[in-house]
A protein has these predicted regions:
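Active-site-proximal, well-structured secondary-structure segments within enzyme catalytic domains
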Residues: 1-81, 88-120
Length: 120
């Protein structure tokens, strides 16, 4: 876990809160709408977190199972000269853990592609 805690802890908290609030629209989460290191540490502490046992810990488990399954599949496919490839998104959804965690890193008013002044 220690090598993945930078992304796994915020992700687990985000998933747990999204389940509690029944939405990923984090700006609707009241005082939990703003994420910081203290909040993440508080909500991932197994001794004191009100969401740890049913939410955060479950996400840790799911991510571990996914890791093990992908590792096994990758090892199996490697025997046949097949490699698994991932995909990197160009854009980020404003309802994502990345935006909740570090909103200052994203601009949502950028336009891509042809502008309205371009006419064929």
């Amino acid at each position: 876990m220690s090598e993945n805690q930078e992304w796994l802890k915020p992700y687990a908290v985000f998933c747990a809160l999204a389940e509690i609030f029944q939405t990923t629209e984090h700006w609707l989460w009241g005082h939990l709408a703003k994420c910081d290191d203290k909040l993440i540490e508080k909500l991932t502490d197994p001794e004191t977190s009100p969401i740890y046992s049913e939410g955060v810990h479950f996400v840790y488990y799911l991510q571990w199972r996914l890791h093990m399954q992908l590792k096994e599949a990758s090892t199996y496919l490697k025997q046949f000269g097949i490699a698994l490839k991932g995909d990197l998104p160009i854009g980020v959804d404003k309802r994502s853990v990345d935006v909740w965690r570090k909103p200052e890193l994203f601009r949502f008013y950028t336009k891509y592609g042809r502008t309205s002044r371009c006419v064929r």
